[in-house]
Amino acid sequence: MMSERAMPKPNCTEEVDVGTIEFARLGRRVVEGRFDGGSMTSDGGVMLLGEVDRKLGLLEAAARCIADPRSPLLIKHGVRDMLRQRVYGLALGWEDLNDHGALRCDVAMQTAVGVDREVASAPTLCRLEKWADRATAWRLHRVLVDQFIASFKTVPEELVLDFDATDNPLHGQQEGRFFHGYYDSYCYLPLYVFCGQQLLCAYLRSSCIDGARHAAAILKLLVRRLRQEWPEVRIIFRGDSGFCRQRIINWCERAG
């Protein structure tokens, strides 16, 4: 048996240099990630998210898809900044717009968005969402597909498009709510299309329809765009038995 004297003891007072993470500057403000300053925010990951977003330019491009009806002389929070705030909040788990009553004062959120003051309030973000219409949705999906294409350094030989319809449960009297027997709840039935880990389409729909509805039209549009970029790429449609519809099968056979 090892004696108490011989047992090693941890040195709890030893200083460990964990280094410093340097982020992009905001004006004259130097932004660093350190581990010796105490608990300043519970959402520090938003800084990394902001850096990745700026490198991709995703929300910068998405903001150009949303028409701003406001007078330029009266704008305090731009569309790009509000979109960043909303999307970053969702990524952090803050889904409710009311959460931004507190988040707008969070220094980490402000810095990630790219401002040095309070970001937009919940009512302002609500108005942003109201500006989006069907044309906005089409433009946003074009951004997703263009980002997907830009992610390839070489021409792919094969692409597998995964189609799936799933439930989005509802807990109130939202417009377009219907009871879905399979999911045994009131829900929406969005249609998603992925290629690997990348999202190509997210189409919000009522649940009173066939889960495969719209799939043929979306498949046709995606294949057309992808083959504009890569004429020889092999494209595979993949879905569960719910997508075994004659219209989809016939189109796939014609398109090759």
Residue ranges and their predicted role:
Residues 1-210, 214-231:
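Dynamic "connector" segments at or just before major functional cores
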Residues 249-256:
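Short, surface-exposed basic-aromatic patches at helix termini and helix-loop junctions that form
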Residues 164, 232-244:
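Acidic/histidine-rich, metal-coordinating catalytic segments
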Residues 170, 244-246:
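Conserved protein kinase catalytic core
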